[in-house]
Regions:
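Aromatic-Pro/Gly-enriched surface loop or interdomain linker
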Residues: 2-66, 222, 228, 280-281, ...
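Extracellular ligand-binding/catalytic regions of CAZymes and related secreted enzymes
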Residues: 3-22, 43, 187-191, 196-256, ...
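Catalytic beta-strand/loop cores that center a nucleophilic Ser/Cys/Thr
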Residues: 40, 125-205
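A glycine-rich, often tryptophan-bearing local segment used as a flexible ligand/cofactor-contacting loop or short
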Residues: 76-145
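Metal-dependent polysaccharide deacetylase catalytic core of the NodB/CE4 family, i.e.
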Residues: 105, 109-110, 257, 270, ...
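Catalytic grooves of carbohydrate-active enzymes
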Residues: 262-264, 437-507
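His/Asp/Glu-enriched short active-site or ligand-binding loop at hydrolase and phosphoryl-transfer sites
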Residues: 402-431, 439-449, 501-511
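Surface beta-strand/loop "capping" patches
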Residues: 507-548
Length: 585
């Protein structure tokens, strides 16, 4: 068994150059300060599917139709020629979204006259009627809490005053948080926005679980707060660029992604696995089984991971199910365990749970590497997904997952992370260094009220998430059948034709390849656009939203257009498609 090299040395900060490409399609993020929380902006734009590159020169930024300036604009941090170029950019019919604008000669351009720096921000509220169409479809999408209800710690920011147009969003005291202005030049309209609240810092703080108390509920509810911020940025991109292309968030342009996941962490749970798997196999639904490799009898339960488990695991594998790790000890103290040595092996690794608060002879490395070794040894698979018992979350989990060979985590709830989309994780859940680990948060679980009594509210929740193409990750323990099995049967029947169902690993792989995608839009002639997409690996069902008057012509076998969405056929590394435009273009 290989020794795990523990990630005890802090890696270097992720460089903005990681997000620089030669493509000038999408948004230019003009970075003013490398020490800012720009990684939150980058991860957010990746999640929502908006193409972008990070630049540090105004010359490169001006190659784009839409420029996002982050984290601040002041008279002292922005050169006069840059300020002038940004103003001319907007007055020429292109778009600008600027964060924390304090002076610099741009207030009137952005639609306000004065600013106020604040440290008392408690809430951000979007005007639900400010955008046409169905941008806001639920009250939960319009209000974002910026401070916990208990022990509030208000956030800093900027408010804008004496506005030219109604604000897009306001703070709890009624002052403007996001302003808007526009300039029409010929057939082009340039839009200018000032944002007084740091999206990047908020995203990183919440998704790294360092901002507790913001959500109304822990799980089983609709909390799309980060998603609203990201959809706003996507709208700015779409409105500001005539060639806007966006990567959609679900495979094959389905309404949402549905993941059926099971936690097997109780003696009787493994006995019920074949019944759940039979239901899923009969519906051609692959599910993920997070299995505790419990080979020690302790306070929690008797051991149940034995040689007899192999037949069950092999049957799951043969039916197309994913087998994932749910740790060895299933201890709530996982979050407080030592890293370990990286040499932990079965059977000498013997973690013992004394009670809910106490576990001995356990380590994070042991929980990860020993459970993975056992699952890999008993099946013909490589275990790549992990979920901790009790969703106990060590700060070091992301880098320890990477060190022990995992790729995907399902360790947090969608409500606690304020998003119904996957996201990339950072080293030690901090703000500076990204890792190749993706979190797919849990949406619905079965411990807070009888699951069988919650099918209607769960369907309603899934429909809300479907409005914007999110992920519904359902956690069902297999400790009983009856109402839980019936819940799953009804959930699958309700959404089988509308959602894309897959395993955590299947969706995680699709999402990771999508995350690597870079798009370049080229003008072939007055009536033809070429879209070139490159990825790190093979992908099927990647979907792109294009301008409504584009018609797919040719380029990739198996591609199908559905209104303004092109579902791309399977490809590896590179795809090229051509669109025709109306003669008037």
């Amino acid at each position: 068994v290989e020794i795990t090299e523990l990630p005890i040395n802090i890696p270097p900060r992720t460089s903005p150059e990681v997000y620089f490409t030669e493509s000038n399609s999408g948004i230019a993020v003009l970075l003013q300060d490398r020490d800012a929380s720009w990684l939150g902006i980058a991860h957010g734009l990746k999640s929502i599917g908006v193409p972008f590159r990070i630049v540090e020169s105004i010359e490169l930024a001006l190659e784009h139709d839409v420029i996002l300036v982050y984290p601040t604009i002041t008279g002292s941090n922005t050169a006069p020629e840059t300020l002038s170029a940004l103003a001319n950019h907007v007055r020429g019919g292109k778009s600008l979204i600027a964060f924390s604008v304090i002076g610099g000669g741009l207030p009137l351009l952005l639609g306000f006259e004065s600013t106020e720096e604040r440290r008392d921000l408690l809430e951000l509220n979007f005007d639900s009627g400010i955008f046409d169409g169905n941008f806001f479809q639920d009250p939960a999408e319009t209000s974002i809490r910026l401070s916990a209800l208990e022990n509030p710690a208000p956030m800093p920011g900027v408010s804008y005053h004496t506005l030219k147009n109604p604000p897009i969003a306001t703070y709890d005291n009624g002052s403007a948080a996001i302003t808007q202005n526009s300039y029409t030049v010929g057939d082009r309209t340039g839009y200018a926005y000032a944002v007084g609240f740091d999206f990047g810092h908020f995203i990183l703080r919440v998704q790294n679980d360092r901002f507790a108390g913001l959500a109304d509920t822990y799980v089983n509810d609709y909390q799309p707060k980060i998603d609203t911020l990201l959809r706003f940025l996507a709208k700015v991109h779409r409105d500001g660029s005539p060639d806007a292309v966006q990567f959609l968030t679900t495979p094959f342009n389905q309404e949402f992604t549905a993941l059926i996941t099971h936690d097997i962490d109780f003696t009787r749970s493994i006995e019920n696995v074949p019944t759940y798997a039979a239901l899923e196999a009969s519906q051609d639904i692959p599910a993920t089984y997070f299995l505790q490799t419990k080979y020690v009898t302790d306070y929690n339960d008797s051991l149940f991971f034995t040689q007899d488990s192999q037949a069950t695991l092999q049957s799951l594998h043969d039916q197309g199910m994913e087998i994932a790790s749910h740790s060895v000890a299933h201890s709530n103290e996982f979050k407080n365990m030592e890293l370990g040595t990286g040499t932990e092996t079965y059977p000498s690794y013997q973690p013992f749970v004394f009670n809910f608060e106490t576990v001995r002879k356990a380590s994070i490395a042991g929980e990860l590497r020993v459970s993975k070794f056992l699952l890999d040894s008993l099946t013909a698979q490589t275990t790549v997904s992990f979920r901790p018992g009790h969703l106990s979350l060590p700060y070091e989990l992301p880098e320890m997952l990477l060190a022990t060979g995992y790729k995907y985590s399902s360790s947090m709830t969608a409500n606690s992370t304020l998003t119904h989309l996957p996201f990339r994780m950072n080293y030690s859940r901090n703000y500076d260094t990204e890792l190749d680990i993706f979190e797919i948060p849990i949406t619905i679980e079965d411990e807070r009220g009888r699951l069988g009594d919650r099918i209607d509210e769960s369907i309603a929740l899934a429909n809300k998430i479907a409005n914007h193409g999110g992920v519904v990750n359902v956690l069902i323990h297999t400790d009983v059948l009856d109402h839980k099995l019936e819940f799953e049967r009804r959930f699958i029947a309700e959404f089988k034709e509308r959602a894309w169902f897959g395993t955590v690993a299947q969706f995680g792989h699709w999402w990771a390849v999508r995350d690597s995608a870079v798009v370049k839009v080229e003008t072939v002639n007055t009536q033809t656009k070429r879209v070139l997409i490159t990825t790190d690996g093979a992908i099927d069902g990647l979907s792109i939203r294009v301008p409504k008057d584009w018609t797919y012509e040719e380029g990739l076998e198996g591609s199908q257009q559905q209104d303004d969405v092109l579902v791309l056929g399977p490809f590896e590394d590179i795809a090229q498609v051509l669109f025709s435009l109306p003669a008037s273009n």
